[in-house]
Amino acid sequence: MKTKLNFNMWIPTRILFGADELKNLHSQQMPGKKALLAISNGKSTRANGYLAATEEQLRLAGVESVVFDRIEANPLKSTVMAGAAAAREHGCDMIVALGGGSVMDAAKAIALMASNDGDLWDYVFGGTGKEQQAEHAPLPVVAVTTTAGTGSEVDPWGVVTNEQTHEKIGVEAAFPVLAVVDPKLMLTVPP
């Protein structure tokens, strides 16, 4: 059996890959001056020192950061809306996602809603979504992944659960502008 595999691929995300690449984050051109630093509502990001290391890299890059630590596994629409409100309240002009797929998915949706009015489901295409085009571009996202598997650090999608309708739908929000894939951040992931 012969298989013909043809595809086109476009990934505008700059990728820093390798051991200790997080230590090079400060040398990258940052897309903003104040970041909402999105992490999970768990303990590992802090306990393993990843949050402190990322905050230090942002500080060295001249970027202020505000931590948003409410993202749950399978992020909820209400969490995205709270994150967007926090980004607006603190005058953030970029989002940094530090975590696994759920954090990165939520961060991309937060980036969309931080720069657009209404409800996230206004911009969802599918299910009960209202299929509106966003008026403004999302805030730029920097993704620092601490797990491997979803590819959320290099795709534009964010899967979010609408707790009112029980829908779990991918929202095309934003390609991260920069992804840090540092295998040392994944050493604590269970096998």
Where are these regions (language model features)?
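Secondary-structure boundary/capping motif
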Residues: 46-47, 75, 106, 152, ...
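Gly/Ser-rich catalytic serine loop of serine hydrolases
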Residues: 97-103, 149
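A glycine/threonine-rich phosphate-anchoring loop and its flanking beta-alpha core
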Residues: 13, 116-191
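ATP/NTP phosphate-donor binding region
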Residues: 1-94
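Short, conserved catalytic/metal-binding motifs centered on acidic residues
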Residues: 18, 101, 145
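Glycine- (often His-adjacent) and acidic-residue-rich active-site loop
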Residues: 60, 72, 112-124
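Generic enzyme active-site microenvironment
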Residues: 68, 103-107, 143, 180
